[in-house]
Amino acid sequence: MIFSISGDTGGEPDSDNAQIVFNDRVRLNLTTSFTGKDALITGLQAYNFTAGKPITGTGSVAETLFPNDASILGEGMTSFNYEPQFAGFNPQNLQPGCGNNSVCLYKLLYITPVADNFTVFVGPKAEVTDAFPTIVPFASEGQGTLSRAFAINPVLRVSGGTTETGLASAAGFIYKPNDVVDWRALYGSVNAAIPQNEGFPGTPLGAGLFNGSFVAATQLTLYPTENLDLGFNYAYSYHQINILGTGLTGAAAGTLGGLPLTTPVNVNSVGATLTWRINPSIYFTGYGAYFMVDQANGGSAFTDLASWMAGLYFPDAFAEGNTAGLMFGQPLTRVGAGNGATLTPANISNRATPYQIEAFYNYKINNNLSITPGAFVIFNPEGDSNNSTTGVFALRTTFTF
């Protein structure tokens, strides 16, 4: 159970500051085992976040601060780690969805071992992070970093991989031959339950398991020493419309700048993540990610995007059980484009590389309650130097039972 008070300042020159808001997100996860080794995970969720009015209108923090630069799906660099990506509407049909503290099913996943060191999983509502190790020590939505940008490697988010709304159906495997090697892979579809592909706007993501947007992803995790974790990611995804589905930037929609939203795209994504436990009191962590987006309907337009982060994590900071984090990096942004796709779309006044710095402190009151004050500052937000430096602060309270 998460409660947060947050505020934002900055944004586009003529934009309004977002109001100070109070948000909640409540989850109930039920785990059932039939053999003692398997697990059926059922997750219920309610929240009061809003992603704004999809396609037209406003309502999200990103749309308030960046009315021209934010995604038409309410995505932007100011998003929180614990904020559902498509809050309050269903991107499968652009209709209202779960929100306003309605209780909805956000996770349904079955995991079972089938042989020594080999496990399979399948579910109609799942996320990539259900299967892949996050490696970043402050990835926790309730007790880790506040921003969405620095929580996990962005490759894990491609094609709605971690929407926190139960969007994707997925199946895959986990292979752990020894204590050093962990290999996992999955196939996921964000439109598996839809029988007919009507195209945009009726079914913008497609329909069926194999006719529309999908992602095929793999992660190789290595533990070469007791104090070092390494992760290597690759994902291939097809998107029926011109989006990434990461929820990390306004460029996640209309990714091929200058081309229509209805343009389908193929995305090849690569990433690497590490955590080095220097000593019991300080960890170094970081990631790098690169996305190669290509037009999929006969054209040759392309756009490349990149992101990186370096951070320090402090277990038992000032007292046992408390943690702290300090991060700096580049939020996901365009770094190249051509053959008809523009590097600087019309909505960007003066292209510049964005940077973000963030700090948080998680204070553990008892085994069930913690509070996390923190803030992050974005320079050249949404990749536009005409935008004012944007600050986001939050006080998050987390109850765990």
Residue ranges and their predicted role:
Residues 14-18, 30, 94-98, 159-161, ...:
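Outer-membrane beta-barrel proteins
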Residues 174-176, 183-277, 281, 292-294:
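Membrane-embedded translocation segments of transport machinery
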Residues 63-70, 74-76, 178-186, 271-291, ...:
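Surface-exposed extracellular loop regions of Gram-negative outer-membrane beta-barrel proteins
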Residues 233-264, 271-275, 285-385:
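Outer membrane beta-barrel transmembrane domains
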Residues 20-26, 102-106, 165-169, 212-216, ...:
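Residues that define the transmembrane beta-barrel architecture of outer-membrane proteins
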